[in-house]
Amino acid sequence: MKKIILVAGGTGGHFFPAVALGEELIKRGYEVHFITDLRCQKYINQNMGLIFHILDLKRSDNIFLFLPNLSIAILKAIKLLYNIRSSVIIGFGGYPVIAPMFAAIFLRVPIIIYEQNSYLGKVNKFFASFAKKIAISYEDVKNLPEFVKSKIVVTGGIVRENIRNVCHSRESGNDIKRSKDNIFTVFIFGGSQGAKLFSELIPASIQILMQKQPNLKLNIIQQAALDDQVKIKDIYSKLNINYEFAEFFDNMALKYKEADLVISRAGASTIEELTYIGLPAIFIPLPSAADNHQYYNAKLLADKKAGWCLEQNSISAEELADKILDLINNPKILEDTSQNLLKRRKEGHVLLSDLIERVI
């Protein structure tokens, strides 16, 4: 049985697409090893069928501390890769892949890089010259060196199976899931970074929106820290709207199914999932994201009329309220946006698996 190594860590945004790829490769008869870091250990479920290995590279801004840490991590990675003896290694970018990629170069294990954002990250750019192939989610990824363009294969985004199943239940894209009572549901998430935007500006927008259209039947599903939930609940209760809060939704597939519109950050995994199921969103990119990649992700969809991009540093509560109201009152816009999203959908887990099989 041939062995394949996947390397992803740091955040769930890297981890879960790699898991989805691993599950597809297992179905094809491969033994799949998954190298991740301590931050993603909490996501590990042994029922996934993957063989997990924890390899942590301690971060440091001090070069004299970082280099010894990197050296130790590379030596550990070399030992691990030597023992596994895989046919290929696939890196998902970010800090956690550095040591395994160096180990793969040393042991001459073929490398495939997967870039899920619309802007090639620093780590992926560094290892691009060593890669056999570079799989990308978007046709027009920025920051690609000219000399690697012959290695590029567009595979699209990789989406978890439970999220993919939502698409089948929504039938014709967005399907504008309003109940018999004509309730419009907005799903708001991604507030763990820059939470002030989600705990203050968005509730203020909802207040303005309800003042402008007081008879509107609105349902809000919102991710919010416990400390913020009390004050947001107070606002929504006075507005007489339905609401549901959680610090973290572990049933994202169900929430997607309930929603008519999403308001979120513009991380690659979020965009890939919404694209796959055709669920329209207002994106507010995280300004501090590496290489400003969230802005490029959201802008790309906005340019294709497949979403809306509002920048955190310039957006006002009034502007956001007007945008939400415009979409609520013009369902055709949501339907068209949904179809534009679905036009971009690819079976990334299948296409990247096909690419891996061609390399090995």
Swiss-Prot record:
Keyword Protease tagged: no
Listed Pfam families: Glyco_tran_28_C (PF04101), Glyco_transf_28 (PF03033)
Signal peptide: none
Cellular compartments annotated: Cell inner membrane
Annotated CDD domains: GT28_MurG
A GO molecular-function annotation: undecaprenyldiphospho-muramoylpentapeptide beta-N-acetylglucosaminyltransferase activity
Entry GO CC: plasma membrane
Protein's UniProt keywords contain Transferase: yes
UniProt keywords, alphabetically: Cell cycle, Cell division, Cell inner membrane, Cell membrane, Cell shape, Cell wall biogenesis/degradation, Glycosyltransferase, Membrane, Peptidoglycan synthesis, Transferase
Predominant location: membrane
Enzyme Commission number: 2.4.1.227
Pathway the protein contributes to: Cell wall biogenesis; peptidoglycan biosynthesis
NCBIfam families from the UniProt entry: murG (TIGR01133)
PANTHER family: GLYCOSYLTRANSFERASE, UDP-N-ACETYLGLUCOSAMINE--N-ACETYLMURAMYL-(PENTAPEPTIDE) PYROPHOSPHORYL-UNDECAPRENOL N-ACETYLGLUCOSAMINE TRANSFERASE 1
Listed name of the protein: UDP-N-acetylglucosamine--N-acetylmuramyl-(pentapeptide) pyrophosphoryl-undecaprenol N-acetylglucosamine transferase
Species whose genome carries this gene: Rickettsia felis (strain ATCC VR-1525 / URRWXCal2)
